[in-house]
Amino acid sequence: MTDTVHEQDSGATAGQAPSADEGLPSTGEESPSADEELSSAERNRRTRERRIAVHRTARRVLNRPGHLHTVRERLALLDDVQDLFDLDGPVDMYGNGVVEALEERTAGLLGLEAAVFFPTGTMAQQVALRCWAGRTGDPVVALHGLSHPEVHERNAFSRVSGLRPVRLTSEPRPPTAAEVRDFEEPFGTLMLELPLRDAGYVLPTWEELTEVVAAARERDAVVHFDGARLWETTTHFGRPLEEIAGLADSVYVSYYKSLGGFGGAALAGPRTLVEEARAWRHRYGGNLFQQFPTALSALAGLERALPRLPEQVAHARVVAAALREGFAAAGVPWVGVLPEVPHTHEFRVWLPYDAEVLGEASLRQGEETGVLLFSGPWDPAGPGISVAEVGVGVAGLEWTADDVRAAVAAFVAALEG
């Protein structure tokens, strides 16, 4: 499924079926014309504009992600930030000032020695793994086949940073300790994405995570966490952030995923690694002149959004159960909610209908009732099967289980209408 703030590789995304004619001999039919391709692009553009309009006018939604807001609404995130940082002090230049304050706050929350701000997570992780490769003498990075660098970053590890990713597994679950311990070739770094978004925001149990880390240590490998959404994991693991982050040698976190900031990321770990990463950040073009709007929005997210995430995770479990009950009561042949009990405040829903049909029903429900049950796109996941992501944000905390079941009934009515 397409996340509007992520770059996508060409080809099918995780969880989607390949094109129906992929790998088959030509039927002799002509390829779509440029006009048809343009028409398809125009259709997609109009659908997106319609989705944004419905989202903005809906009186009730489960989540209000930042990329669907107006500029004015996003600027409101900086209201009252004077309580978080002295706005009468000097503005930041090349990473000092408010950026340094954000780095210190992040390192403290994660219980790690230091942190360095990056404009993107893609850059942060390339720098982290490049630094570890230099220290271990091994450019091989063991990771999951559905991890973000493999699916969404256009092979940047190998093309830009000289790293060689190897896949422990591509199954829609976290890698196991046995897969790490018994992998057939050496690797210098193990990268774990927590949660694994393209497998459905899944997490291992705490015991499984510690066993996987121990298996990597047995191989003398460094452990790096792709923790873009690590902020969401404390409820599932039953551990504080600093204990979770403390399992790894380095951790990347995002300031817009989960926290709703304007953008940005941080790499946290030993002070010597962080200082080396600053040099590489400059070489990669990431040492921007001023970052105060983004840094202030990140501080606001840490102060306001982070404390509410456990409540959202708990309520996502209520919403997921009510969705299953609602679709069963409406007579839908089957529904998949994965994970069955969400590990974070985000999960996936699978239904036995074409994506275009489900997308149209979602929009029509929002337009006609003011209630938007599925605010994101539906994507094909096989013949006659589609999948959508559901996130329970602060707005979703207002929904009761009865509200969800009623919205499902209205959605199915729109589907059949």
Label every PLM stretch briefly:
Residues 115-122, 254-255, 290:
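Active-site nucleophile and cofactor-binding loops and adjacent substrate-binding regions
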